[in-house]
Amino acid sequence: MSFDLASRLAARRAEDLYRQRPLLQSAQGPDVVVDGQPLLAFCSNDYLGLASHPEVIAALRAGAERWGVGGGASHLVVGHSGPHHELELALAEFTGRPRALLFSTGYMANLGAVTALVGKGDTVLEDRLNHASLLDAGLLSGARFSRYLHNDPASLAARLDKAEGNTLVVTDGVFSMDGNLADLPALAAVAQARGAWLMVDDAHGFGPLGAAGGGIVEHFGLGQEQVPVLIGTLGKGFGTAGAFVAGSEELIETLVQYARPYIYTTSQPPAVACATLKSLELLRRESWRREHLAALIARFRRGAEALGLTLMDSFTPIQPILVGGSRQAVALADMLRARGIMVGAIRPPTVPANSARLRVTLSAAHSEAQVDRLLEALGESWRQLSSSLLAEIEAEEGDDA
């Protein structure tokens, strides 16, 4: 029997869930060209505006001249170069931990950490709204896998009471589709009381959160004792690419020995590590980026609430606007695009049914005037969408008469 892929694709189209790739024809930044159209983008995760920073670009160029453009081999063969090692030392110091270990992607870091730490006879407990890479890691680990209610320490405690073997509690730091923060102090207390380890994927926290950009752990004033396993990605707040795990000497050595996504892959280009060293320097030095970003977030929320839009409880750069139906979310995104604004429409299965949304993301590279332009376009588009929905309802009522 052949694979009926055409039917699967047709069903996805019929449900307004078909994914397509926009073609970016410019550098990352607020002003982009996508599929030939100039747009003002509010959908990038380049939270501090470092992806196109001249000093980061210069560091990448110099790194390529010195180290070439390929990693060449895995870290355990001959792919662990000087810049990789220097970046690991810098990330360890930045996170206040003995060591850090580089991975090529955030997905690989999450998969590598979970599967190296737990297996058959152990338990992994995850927040229901965790990123797909964390959920996949839990399922693939071979450990008993269960999800607790979103950000609910009591639900976690009930599952911990039934846990067996080594137990790993896993949560996003900032939830990527909602923008809210994990209740780390409460989750850490519950995990510690029951002898479990807490692993936090702070992909969206490093850079925007914390006095020095140290993410959610710094934001809450926690340390390695409360959060033994800390994951960070480098393609968001850092503006480059890759990911890392930070923790104890024993943790990192365990990953070197047992994390298959680390062992069996070519290292990232060393020039990228050179660029990340520069972006880390800028992230720590230029606190004005976090301050400006926080002001833009507050400005956007005031304006969106004045328009009557339904926002989620978030003070991070991720500012979702709840729409409900997938078709309506896509229509609203299309209306914004017609006005020169690019915002992503997020639909099931990425988010729960009937909670489709626009995922607005803000960056320190945006200006107040650009945020005001977004709000103006949102107001016009929301009124247009409401009028269209009302016309559809009236037409349906007419058909039923």
Swiss-Prot record:
GO terms for molecular function: 8-amino-7-oxononanoate synthase activity; pyridoxal phosphate binding. Its EC number is 2.3.1.47. Substrate binds at residues 19, 131, 350. It is an enzyme of class 2 (transferase). Gene3D superfamilies: Aspartate Aminotransferase, domain 1, Type I PLP-dependent aspartate aminotransferase-like (Major domain). The keyword Transferase applies. It catalyses: 6-carboxyhexanoyl-[ACP] + L-alanine + H(+) = (8S)-8-amino-7-oxononanoate + holo-[ACP] + CO2. Homodimer. Belongs to the class-II pyridoxal-phosphate-dependent aminotransferase family. BioF subfamily. This is 8-amino-7-oxononanoate synthase. It comes from Pseudomonas paraeruginosa (strain DSM 24068 / PA7) (Pseudomonas aeruginosa (strain PA7)).
